[in-house]
């Protein structure tokens, strides 16, 4: 699975560094325009390869993702769909990429991307009603997007209930998110506790378990696990193993999150796990990348 979908909370300030268990779009790294020439050179190299069109498209998607040219990513995914046909995975990627662009744009300009996001997720679920990443993404989108723009809170709740029947851990997480955003702390905590119990039972830190546990989930699920465990200080080992698996996987080259945030999460989890020395090294790495990253500055000031 690819990691193109991220949570959609459309009233966040893009540049804020607010910490929340269910918000992470504001930690997407935006690459400077200074890299445009390097980007062009990398694309030009691909076009000289003797490969099929579909292989070149897949490589171009990786390069465009690396340089955050998300409009290009959308064009390439649409071309891939023209060649290979629609699939839940491709529609999930397409919906997620449109969602990121919707978040980055001003509200008026985000409407077209919101529509494309919702349409892609809906079509993906027609092809496979049990596609877990799409279900989780669609639930979040439907609950977060204003009704006038296509959101539907009642539908989101029904889908979350269905998701719980397919995957308990994903369903519990979606229900916790819904109640958290609705400021119903009692129900949010109820589903979070169920999520943590399910996470504990998966024993993802055992040697072969991560591949088994995450085989039908998006890479973003790993980030969700590490983010939520670090925020609530529960199931720390599982959160750390999930984050390490994310960083060490071959799909990390598709990572869109800022490395300073990734190092912050790992530093916090490592600290909570009792390793202050390693945590200090990681938080310094975060601040070396971005000396103004407030979460890391605050964490360093309070804990060291």
Describe these PLM feature segments.
Residues 68-75, 86, 92-123, 127-130, ...:
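Short coil/linker segments at helix-helix boundaries
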Residues 28, 53, 62, 87, 96, 103, 131, 168-170, ...:
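Residue-level recognition of tetratricopeptide repeat
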Residues 140, 144, 213-261:
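Alpha-helical adaptor scaffolds
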Residues 56, 90, 134, 171-173, ...:
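TPR alpha-solenoid repeat register
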Residues 45-46, 80, 124, 162-163, ...:
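Canonical positions in the second alpha-helix
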Residues 15-75, 89-92:
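N-terminal leader/linker segments that initiate helical-solenoid repeat arrays
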Residues 25, 59, 93, 100, ...:
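"A position-specific structural signal for the A-helix of alpha-solenoid helical repeats
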């Amino acid at each position: 699975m690819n990691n193109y979908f991220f949570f959609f909370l459309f009233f966040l300030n893009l540049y804020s560094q607010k910490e929340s268990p269910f918000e992470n779009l504001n930690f997407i790294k935006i690459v400077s325009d200074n890299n445009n020439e390097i980007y062009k050179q990398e694309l030009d190299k691909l076009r000289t390869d003797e490969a099929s069109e579909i292989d070149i498209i897949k490589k171009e998607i990786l390069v465009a993702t690396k340089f955050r040219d998300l409009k290009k990513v959308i064009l390439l995914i649409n071309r891939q769909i023209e060649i290979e046909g629609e699939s839940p995975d491709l529609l999930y990627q397409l919906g997620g990429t449109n969602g990121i662009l919707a978040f980055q744009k001003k509200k008026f300009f985000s409407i077209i991307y919101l529509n494309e996001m919702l349409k892609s997720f809906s079509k993906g679920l027609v092809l496979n009603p049990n596609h877990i990443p799409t279900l989780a993404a669609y639930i979040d989108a439907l609950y977060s997007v204003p009704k006038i723009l296509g959101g539907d809170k009642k539908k989101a709740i029904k889908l979350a209930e269905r998701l719980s029947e397919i995957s308990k851990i994903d369903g519990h997480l979606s229900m916790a998110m819904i109640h958290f955003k609705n400021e119903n702390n009692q129900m949010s905590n109820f589903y979070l506790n169920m999520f943590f119990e399910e996470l504990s039972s998966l024993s993802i830190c055992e040697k072969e378990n991560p591949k088994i546990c995450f085989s039908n989930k998006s890479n973003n699920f790993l980030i969700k696990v590490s983010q939520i465990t670090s925020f609530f200080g529960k199931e720390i080992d599982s959160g750390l193993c999930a984050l390490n698996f994310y960083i060490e996987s071959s799909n990390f080259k598709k990572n869109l999150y800022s490395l300073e945030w990734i190092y912050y999460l790992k530093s916090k989890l490592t600290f909570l796990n009792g390793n202050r020395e390693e945590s200090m090294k990681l938080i310094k790495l975060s601040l070396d990348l971005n000396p103004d990253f407030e979460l890391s500055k605050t964490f360093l000031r309070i804990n060291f």
